[in-house]
Amino acid sequence: MDYFHYPIDRDRETIAKMVKLFPTFCEKIDKGDFYIACAMGLHRTDIALCTYWVFYAADKGTVPPPIRGYRQENGHNTNKIMRVLNAFYQYMTERDGKEPMPIEVFKERKKVVNELSKL
């Protein structure tokens, strides 16, 4: 089994690491036979998979990932996911001098993630 550490948080330093490692993260998911674990119970798996979908897999026609930790029925919401997605988008925009996708597309994808937390 191959080990790959993909950090998840919304602070600028971690977002920079996430963006840098993102192509490798996507490649590992695309190859299949992967396992994602968040040992702290902070539901970072949801955040990682939503980032993968919003910024990469949705463009390939992949269905969005199911939300397991941030479910409304369990008293949670998607605020943490949204904060990371927003920080990721902002960092990429600043780094590249252009938006990674049109803001309307980004908002629509975030809306899909929010809806998934209600299912």
Which residues make up each language-model segment?
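Cysteine-based protein phosphatase catalytic domain of the PTP/DSP
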Residues: 1-36, 50-87
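Glycine-rich nucleophile elbow surrounding the catalytic serine of serine-hydrolase chemistry
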Residues: 42-47
